[in-house]
């Protein structure tokens, strides 16, 4: 026989339609976003993982100063690897960006054509899709270097450049000012061959089964290569940021978004629990009568759980539909807006269904069952008498009669709803944390750019490069080349100052190993103004990231060797652009046995124009130093708006639902005050103002809590995700903005609650009179 209680469900839904509609919307949007994200993330991760085999991605690469001879290549391949040429040339374009030109790769690191066609004739080029998007280029447009104009025939994704790192040691990839492209073999040969980089990819004959074995194989291979040729750089695949940064980032994003889902579900479940408790209080007489009539506690628990679970299921269903259609494209667009990923096919994600549908329903069931089981343990007689307290009657908190009647009344309202306000506080902390992150990142990036600009070592840092001929087999050629290099790197620029440099790596630990540039500067340097003496200074970025203070010792290692160096820190130099170490030029040259006259580059405040371009390895200027903030702004700028909107939505829902409960809980008292002649405005001052006071206090209390939490989150994110360091700087106006957003949100909700107070009838006070 059907239970008559089912007939109550439509009436309960109608009477609480506003509450259930709001909860349904937030659940559908939250589950839709998470489902869309997990489906897009899973599909793109599948495409990313499959690309290693589909596009035959290299197991690593190495660079040499000169092209390998057939004999050298044969000797290296005796180490159970296959070596492939993958030469490239970097050139500046007239739009201010740098392009890395490749020939089309047909054996290793194959190319995914996203749009258009591959270049077939001279003057045609296929550019990276991400670079094209960021520079507003499309098929049919042209790009130009100093000598030639290329017409874009296709947009591509290079399988070994899913993240556009110009240098593997860079803190962040740069898809705005750096790109990769494919040209015909004829056009490649026509480029400046002086700048060709002899880059070689290798593939193991037998793939290593584990990462540990891969590391061992890479170390053995590097030692074998060192006996054959001088290696300029050696990067096994597992260390290649251009390949693995994307996959690692997608994996970490997934964990974060799942945690977000469960936190929202838990908050909503507790809100449901409180609303159900309020319903039980309102219907205490009915529940007592039903229990006395023979209905069991189990039947009533199932009845009151029905609507929350049904709403959760419908919200999950609608959310999944949105996730697999509209929102999947939004989430995929975020990844395509950051990374040069190949095309993907949407795949069914059973794990996403479990996480976004089954788990939220289980959370709702467990929390609501627990609350209902606890609330319905009282006897039927107690429900009929409306005595819902399991303990002795609480004594009212004594309030001084010196306080005005309105103030005392508001305090009573606050004390009566303390549990609701605690849940509200949790909701405010969570929403504020999201809002904090959304407002903080643009502010941090802007401050980082300003900080870099203010404390650059020099407007230009020129790193010199020894020509290939200087390390050839012929001693005479080497001597002549070094003499030409010595004369060719002299400059008449009056702002130029020599420095020596050496690169070491940090010891991996809490953070992954990263490159550290050691600068050797002149004793009376006009650029590095520090009392170096025989001591060592570290940059503020180094000190902040690794929490090093003057007097501490730091240990660094050779990148491709096991040799280590330990230095005692004399002081911290105000430079946040890189993880760096400073010492005198004589000390650096002596420490690394470089020769007393050795120098590696120039500091300068104006461009150096009298050094041959072939001797300049790289130029570090403001554009190079701010690539981190520039790329993060491009990658995450749109996402921050989404985060802010989501935070405001959480604010409104939690405040609306709990404010609504407080009004309903006090409906009889509100009705009585109307009978006594109080106006709607005066009643609003009693109830709405009470909640407003609590909201203001909770908003203010949440700020220091969120600051502590954000410091921890930001540090972990920087240590695990990036090389280099960005200082966490919180603009004071962010606190004002967070407070105003929370307060304005409550004002908007208060207007809705004022309408609800106006609708409370006077005869409500005559009902349920004991």
Spans of model-derived segments:
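Juxtamembrane segments of multi-pass membrane proteins
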Residues: 62, 405-545, 549-552, 556-558
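Short cytosolic juxtamembrane segments of multi-pass membrane proteins
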Residues: 3, 377-394, 755-770
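Short helix-loop junctions at transmembrane helix boundaries
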Residues: 317-355, 697-764
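Short, membrane-interfacial amphipathic segments enriched in basic
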Residues: 1-7, 392-408
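Membrane transport/envelope proteins' first extracytoplasmic loop
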Residues: 2-269, 278, 332, 337, ...
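Hydrophobic alpha-helical transmembrane segments of multi-pass inner-membrane transport and secretion
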Residues: 15-44, 249-288, 306-323, 354-366, ...
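Short coil/turn motifs that cap or connect alpha-helices
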Residues: 138, 296-297, 379, 549, ...
